[in-house]
């Protein structure tokens, strides 16, 4: 069984298309900042793509403490297998306690695949998330 004390931090999968960040990235990083402040940890953006290091700094203005950039020509365009492998490898290595992925077409493909590979739960379409030491409260659209 995993030692959950090893897991620390709130991560946001930051989606880019053709070298531009998506508006959902900024919304998620802002929400992640609130969660991280409650949990007493850092916000990390995870940005995959080709030649995307230059756009990573934009996330700092919305609350990201740091951004991990996985830059490769193989990641220029989204492919399920490549992105899921990189995201899962990063999660397994660095162990964030929360990973936020936007409810976009890519997020709806990537999120469940990562959850299955990581043997963890997934909450889809949450509009608000409160975390405390003893509980998690989610708000879902009706």
Task: Give names to the regions the model predicted.
Residues 12-27:
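Short, glycine-rich nucleotide/cofactor-binding loops
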Residues 25-36:
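Histidine-anchored nucleotide/phosphate-binding helix
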Residues 44-49:
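Short internal beta-strands
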Residues 58-79:
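A glycine-rich helix N-cap at a beta->alpha junction
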Residues 95-96:
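Proline-aspartate-enriched helix->loop->beta-strand connector
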Residues 106-118:
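Short Gly/Thr/Asp-enriched flexible loops that form oxyanion-binding sites at enzyme active sites
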Residues 117-135:
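Short, acidic/small-residue loops that bind anionic groups at enzyme active sites
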Residues 136-142:
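Conserved small/polar residues in nucleotide/adenosyl-binding loops
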């Amino acid at each position: 069984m995993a030692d959950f004390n090893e897991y620390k931090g709130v991560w946001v999968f930051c989606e880019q298309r053709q070298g531009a960040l998506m508006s959902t990235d900024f919304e998620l990083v802002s929400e992640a900042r609130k969660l991280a402040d409650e949990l007493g940890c850092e916000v990390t953006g995870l940005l995959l793509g080709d030649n995307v290091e230059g756009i990573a700094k934009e996330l700092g203005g919305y609350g990201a403490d740091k951004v991990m950039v996985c830059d490769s020509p193989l990641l220029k365009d989204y492919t399920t297998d490549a992105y899921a492998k990189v995201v899962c490898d990063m999660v397994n290595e660095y162990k964030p306690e929360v990973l936020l992925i936007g409810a976009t077409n890519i997020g709806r493909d990537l999120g469940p695949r990562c959850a299955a590979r990581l043997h963890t739960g997934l909450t889809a379409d949450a509009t608000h998330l409160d975390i405390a030491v003893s509980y998690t409260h989610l708000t879902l659209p009706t």
